Amino acid sequence: VNHYSTMWETGKAMLVCIDKVTCVKMYNLIDKYWKLKIKEQENEMKNCLDEQDEKEKSNKLQWLKETEYAVVVSEEQNEIDKFKKWDLDIIPHREKMKKRDLATEFKDNSNPFRLAIVCAMWLTGFDVKSLSILYLDKVLKEHTLMQTIARANRVYEGKNNGLIVDYIGVLKNLREALSKYGTGTNTEGGDSPIGEEKDLIEELVEAIRERSE
C-alpha cells in the first residue's frame, strides 16, 4: 500500500499471490491499510505549503478514494467451506467476479479498478497496457515467469517502464529463464542479461552521486 500509493500516477498494478486463500488474506490487509492511507492523506491536506501543493495532495486523495482493488481467482467446488476454514469469506469476491466484467474494467485505464490480486488468472495471455507495477509473492519459473513479468512490459502512452517488485526471491529463476528464453533461436541458452548485485549497487550509488552534484 505504501509503495503503490507513492507510485499513484504510474498506472495499474497486479499482486501475484501463492494461492487463492492468500489472495483473500492480502485483500483484507490491503483494505485495512488503504483506509489508513486515506486518513493519512486527509491529514496531509491540513499542511499544504501552497496552492500547487494543495492541488497535488488533493489529487492524490481523490485517487486513493476512487481506487478499487479486487480478488480475481477461478471458481472451484466447495470453495465457501474451504475459505471458512481459514476464517475467510469468498462470497463477496465471487459475487463481484460474476456480476462485473473485471477483465474489461482492468484494461480500461480510466476505470478505478487499479489493483488486481491474483494467483493464476491473468498471468499469461492477458494484456493490460497501462499495467506498470507487478508485485510478485509467488515462486514462478521458466515460461510462466517470463509471461508473467511481460504483463508490466507493454508500451503505453506516458508509461516509461514497467516495475517488478519481488517479495519472494525469483532472481535466480529469472536468470535461468532469461538465459533459456531470451536467446532467440539458440536452444543451448546463453549468458544472463542480469548484472551481478554488487555491480548494480555500485552503478546505483554512482547514479545517485551524479544526480546530487
Predicted regions and their residues:
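Conserved C-terminal RecA-like helicase domain
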Residues: V1-V118
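Switch/connector loops and helix/strand junctions flanking conserved nucleotide-binding motifs
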Residues: C23-K25, N78-F83, F126-D127, E142-Q147, ...
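A short beta-strand element within the Helicase C-terminal
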Residues: R114-V118, W122-Q147, G162-D166
